[in-house]
């Protein structure tokens, strides 16, 4: 896109002779004036050669500069360099090392829904004077590819007075809205920096169990949003036998590549960008980058499309899976913070949660292990002290640990608390019950059999198929089944009540029903059958 009234120094450059137009980073730095706002390519597409020269240059004109970057990994833009008064980093992202820097006042966080960021640049609420992005060498037709991070690069290039393309031969050439003609750059700089790679996360038996429970909630033909971490590594393995999954994800990763390569994700049942995986960023190993190179099955688009809840919601059965750090008995979520976390901010999560709510058959799933690596409980009475909270706890559809699934949608606070206690670590449940009773979240007379919690026969779970493909899910009863069992009681006929309880019973309040759902597994066996959609059946 050529802006009216702007000169394009490279407009007449022969694409086949682009190397003759390459300048040194110092030449670019000379054009920067004090007080300018400089947009830097995001995350693994950070233009590290130019950034490194900016950070180390002693040029007198580099004063009071504002650096704008959606996601900063603190690689070239280090926290040490930001201690200088010459630079101030402003980011829309609260993950990775930015979380600590924001708390220390060294980085400014701009709270915003990701889908709205392009509008902030286009409306000049966040003006950009200089745009520096990393691109592939131009093709014979003169088009460079933005590679593995599209985000708002186009908007920044369209509104900047100075556009710099840092050409790196190691970037995969990707498809979608990734192309920028070489003539749109004012300067080209050569980079020999390697890409930033992420090794695959290690998983263990606990994460595998969490993933299996998450996978049980994902139907064939669902459309998925992933991030990075052990949850997603384990989940891809558990989804390998699904059919016609779709991908509409902020980040494309090695596990998503695995799902496409094994045939589980065909993208043929999606409503938007059918036949292709949709994303805006890629994070992963060199194998992923090699696979993405010139791969037409993965579509990279701007974040106002990838993060747009209305676009997301057009896909039926859209499922967003979020790795949680903590959860409390109200269903409030504490998200991850710190280095190693890419999708950490509530704003990034909320766009996809909203999209799932708009999707027919969509759902949001928050998953975590019941305890962290240090053995501390991840299910707490309250996460009020956690620094990175997801405020929309009413939008939390389900929480998953290795001990099962807590369905929260449509449930009261008391019912939520009971369901979450059921999936907490068995050694943490008695304490949670006691604290919840003290806070009047649970009934004061709530029964809890501590030893029974450790004996719960999870291996009895099975699915019974009847005529007409009608399925009944069987499992051992849980304390959180109390409300469902109470409603079932009032649907019984008098004869059914008598045959079940061997005498006439006219009512089944909490005090009575809790005795039937809190089972001593040393002496009693109680099985429930569930029909209908997971979490919404009866």
Residue ranges, per PLM feature:
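Conserved alpha/beta enzyme-core scaffold
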Residues: 2-450, 485
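Long, contiguous binding/interaction regions
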Residues: 455-538
């Amino acid at each position: 896109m050529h802006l009216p009234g702007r000169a394009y120094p490279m407009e007449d450059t022969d694409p086949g002779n682009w190397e003759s137009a390459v300048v040194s980073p110092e030449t670019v730095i000379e054009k920067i004036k004090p007080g300018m706002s400089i947009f830097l390519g995001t995350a693994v597409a950070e233009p590290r050669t130019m950034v490194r020269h900016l950070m180390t240059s002693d040029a007198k004109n580099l004063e009071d500069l504002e650096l704008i970057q959606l996601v900063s990994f603190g690689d070239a833009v280090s926290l040490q360099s930001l201690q200088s008064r010459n630079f101030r980093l402003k980011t829309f992202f609260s993950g990775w090392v930015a979380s600590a820097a924001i708390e220390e006042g060294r980085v400014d966080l701009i709270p915003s829904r990701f889908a709205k960021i392009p509008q902030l640049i286009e409306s000049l609420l966040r003006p950009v004077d200089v745009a520096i992005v990393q691109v592939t060498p131009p093709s014979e037709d003169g088009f460079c590819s933005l590679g593995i991070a599209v985000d708002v690069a186009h908007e920044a290039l369209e509104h900047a007075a100075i556009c710099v393309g840092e050409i790196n031969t190691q970037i995969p050439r990707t498809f979608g809205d990734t192309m920028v003609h070489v003539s749109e750059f004012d300067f080209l700089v050569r980079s020999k920096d390697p890409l930033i790679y992420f090794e695959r996360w290690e998983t263990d038996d606990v994460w595998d169990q969490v993933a299996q429970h998450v996978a049980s909630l994902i139907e064939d033909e669902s459309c998925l949003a992933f991030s990075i971490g052990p949850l997603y590594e384990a989940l891809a393995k558990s989804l390998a036998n699904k059919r016609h999954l779709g991908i509409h994800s902020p980040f494309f990763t090695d596990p998503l590549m695995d799902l496409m390569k094994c045939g589980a994700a065909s993208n043929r049942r999606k409503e938007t960008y059918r036949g292709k995986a949709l994303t805006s960023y890629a994070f992963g190993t060199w194998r992923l980058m090699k696979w993405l190179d010139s791969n037409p099955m993965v579509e990279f688009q701007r974040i106002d499309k990838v993060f747009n809840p209305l676009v997301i919601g057009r896909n039926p059965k859209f499922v967003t899976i979020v790795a949680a750090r903590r959860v409390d008995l109200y269903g409030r979520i504490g998200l991850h913070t710190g280095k190693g976390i890419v999708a950490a901010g509530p704003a990034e999560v909320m766009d996809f949660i909203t999209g799932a709510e708009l999707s027919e058959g969509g759902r949001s799933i928050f998953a975590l292990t019941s305890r962290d690596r240090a053995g501390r409980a991840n299910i707490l009475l309250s996460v009020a002290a956690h620094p990175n909270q997801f405020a929309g706890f009413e939008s939390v559809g389900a929480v998953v640990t290795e001990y099962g699934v807590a369905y929260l949608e449509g449930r009261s606070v008391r019912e939520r608390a009971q369901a979450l206690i059921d999936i907490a670590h068995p050694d943490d449940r008695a304490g949670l019950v006691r604290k919840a009773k003290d806070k009047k979240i649970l009934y004061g007379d709530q029964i809890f059999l501590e030893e029974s919690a450790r004996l719960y026969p999870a291996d009895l779970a099975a699915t019974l198929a009847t005529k007409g493909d009608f399925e009944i899910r069987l499992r051992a009863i849980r304390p959180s089944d109390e409300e469902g069992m109470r409603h079932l009681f009032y649907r019984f006929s008098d004869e059914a009540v008598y045959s079940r309880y061997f005498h006439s019973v006219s009512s089944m309040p909490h005090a009575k029903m809790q005795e039937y759902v809190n089972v001593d597994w040393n002496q009693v066996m109680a099985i429930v059958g569930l029909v209908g959609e997971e979490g919404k059946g009866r």
